[in-house]
């Protein structure tokens, strides 16, 4: 397999390092195939045909379809975090924080691959949550803590239990991804967070 970029904060999440840009054509092809065929039905030959290379080349560059899925997840998560961090740091009220969380949920549920899985491979979602819930929660916690700390800064509060609140936010986000609310995520989150925002005085 081709080398990946080194060191990345994502390695702390238990994910592979961010894939090198040279792999983008393969990961773009994998994403197209996953969105078209689903995770279970996609084969290395599908990815190879999408890129226009041999199956051997795909194996050499990204490995199996499972490997490609993990690398794609690492890349997409890195892109999500990179895009949200500036918005998070610029947020000056609770509505800004809610918008950051909602953006993460929107990114996940509207991602073509995730949308395909949620529509046609729901059994994979159930199995994934049952088998990997703890691992996924740990990953989300590392992303949720900066959000909660920013909320703490905005509110000027020092009584917020950051680890506990971060876990709560992570659990809410995970639930919203695998079972999206009927309405817009931002509206739902604002209602869910209303008691907390009122208690901290962080509401806009």
Regions found by a protein language model. Give the residues of each.
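Short hydrophobic/aromatic patch on the recognition helix
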Residues: 51-62
